[in-house]
A protein has these predicted regions:
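Hydrophobic, proline/glycine-rich low-complexity stretches
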Residues: 1-102
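Hydrophobic beta-sheet segments that form the core/acyl-binding groove
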Residues: 84-128
Length: 128
C-alpha cells in the first residue's frame, strides 16, 4: 500500500505555514459563553477554549471537499485517503487572551508520516 501513497510528494509540504488573524470581540465571547455556559466581562481573561473559535480559515463553498474542509493540496497535503481525523494538538499561547486582542494563528506542517494499521488500513499522519 505504501507504493500507492505518494509519501515523498506529501512530505514536500513539511515546513509549509498558514497564517490567520482575528480579533477577540465581546460578541465572540458572548456567543462562546452562550454555547458553553458562563459569562466573561469585557477586558477580563477569557477561557482558553475560545481559541478554537479564532482565526478560522475562510473558503468559498466551491473550494470545499465532500468532507466540508477546504480541498486538500492547499495548506494540507493532498493525501489520497477518504477521511480526515483530528488526533491531538500542541498549542502555544504567547500572552493571555483578552477581549480586544489581535491574535495570529500560525500553523506549520511539522511532519508527514505513513503508517499501516491492521484495523484501519493505510493512514497518513500530518503533524501540524
Amino acid at each position: 500500500m505504501l507504493d500507492e501513497i505518494p509519501i515523498d510528494l506529501l512530505r514536500t509540504w513539511i515546513g509549509k505555514q498558514d497564517h490567520q488573524t482575528d480579533i477577540i470581540t465581546h460578541e465572540l465571547v458572548k456567543r462562546f459563553n452562550a454555547t458553553l455556559g458562563g459569562y466573561t466581562e469585557i477586558n477580563s481573561e477569557i477561557p482558553l477554549g475560545i481559541h478554537w473559535c479564532l482565526a478560522q480559515p475562510s473558503a468559498v463553498h466551491a473550494d470545499l471537499g465532500e468532507d466540508g474542509h477546504p480541498f486538500k493540496g492547499g495548506f494540507m497535503p493532498p493525501v489520497p485517503l477518504p477521511r480526515r481525523m483530528w488526533a491531538s494538538s500542541k498549542i502555544q499561547f504567547h500572552e493571555t487572551l483578552k477581549v480586544g486582542l489581535n491574535v495570529e494563528k500560525v500553523s506549520t506542517i511539522a511532519d508527514v508520516v505513513f503508517k499501516q494499521s491492521k484495523a484501519s488500513g493505510p493512514l497518513v499522519f500530518v503533524h501540524v
